[in-house]
Amino acid sequence: MNRILTAFLVITWLGTAHAVELLNVSYDPTRELWRQLNERFIAAYAKSPGGQLTIKQSHGGSSAQARAVIDGLEADVVTLALEPDTDAIRKAGLIADGWQKQLPNGSVPYTSTIVFVVRKGNPKGIKDWPDLVKPGTQVITPSPKTSGNGKLSFLAAWGSVVSRGGSEADALEYVTKLYKQVPVLDSGARGSTTTFAQKKLGDVHLTWENEARLEVQEAGGELEIVNPPTSILATPPVAVVDANAKRHGTEAAAKAYLEYLYTDDGQEIIAKNFYRPVKPEVLARHKADFPDVKLFPMTTVAKDWNDAFAKFFGEGKVFDSIYKP
C-alpha cells in the first residue's frame, strides 16, 4: 500500500477502531467508479487502526437522489452531480453550512462534461450542437427534472448558443427545436444509456464523458463518441451528510473516505474511469484520454447554480415551457 496513503489513514482514524458502515448516495453513472474506489479504500482501512469498513452504494438521477436523502435515506456521504442538489440537503438541515470549504477545490474531486454518442459510422453526420436539430434526428438525453445529466445536457445546449455570441432568444429557439426531437426522457443517465445502446432508440445520445466511454466500450464497435467543439464544465461535488454521520458515529470514516479522493491513489482511479482528475500532475499523465473540448463554466448561462435551477428547471420555467410530453 502507498506509504503516504498509509500514513494518512493512521492519522485520520487514530482511536476509531470498530466496524463501520457507510452509505454513499451518488448519481446515476458512477457505479463503476465507486466500486473501484471503495475496494481500494476498504482494503486500506482494514490495514489501519480504523478497523473493518463496509460501503454501500445508492445510485439514481441526482436530483431524485437528493430528494431521497431529504426524505430519509440515511446517507453518510453524498456524491451528487450538481451543487444545488447537495445544497438542497444542506437547506434541509442535514449538511453543515460551508460544506464546499471542507475539502479541496471547493469539494470537487473531479470534473467532467457532456459529449455525444452516435451509431457506427455516424450516419447522421453529427459533429456539433447545431447538427442535433437537423430534421429527422432523434436525440436521447435524460430528464432535467430528475437527472444531473439531463440538466447538464440542457445547459450545454443553451450554452452552445450563448457562448458563441447568440442571444438568449436564439438559445430558447434552439432548445425548443432540440427537445421536440427527444422521443423519451428517462429519469437518469444510465436509463438513457439503456434506451440508446440496448433498445437502439435514437440517433445521438447526450451523456457524461465517462458514461460515453463505457457505453462505447460495451457496444462492440456499434457506437462512436463525437466530442463537440464546446460543452459545459461539470463540477460534481462531494459532502459528508453531517447529521446522519454524527448519529451513525461515522463522521471520521466519512471524512477520510472523501479526503481519499484527493490522494494520488484516488485521483488515479478517477482518471482511469474517465473522469477528469483535479490534480494537474495526474491529469497530465492521462492527457490522451481527455480530448481538447472547450469547456465553458455554468456562469456562461446563469449567475450561479441556484439561478440556473430557478430560471431553467423551476416549476413553469424555461424547460416546462418548451417540453410537452
What are these regions (language model features)?
Residues A19-S147:
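N-terminal segment of the mature folded domain
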Residues G121-K127, T146, G159-S167, N244-A252:
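Short helix-loop capping/hinge motifs at secondary-structure junctions, enriched
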Residues I114-N122, T235-A252, I269-N273:
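A bilobed periplasmic-binding-protein/Venus flytrap-type ligand-binding module shared by bacterial periplasmic
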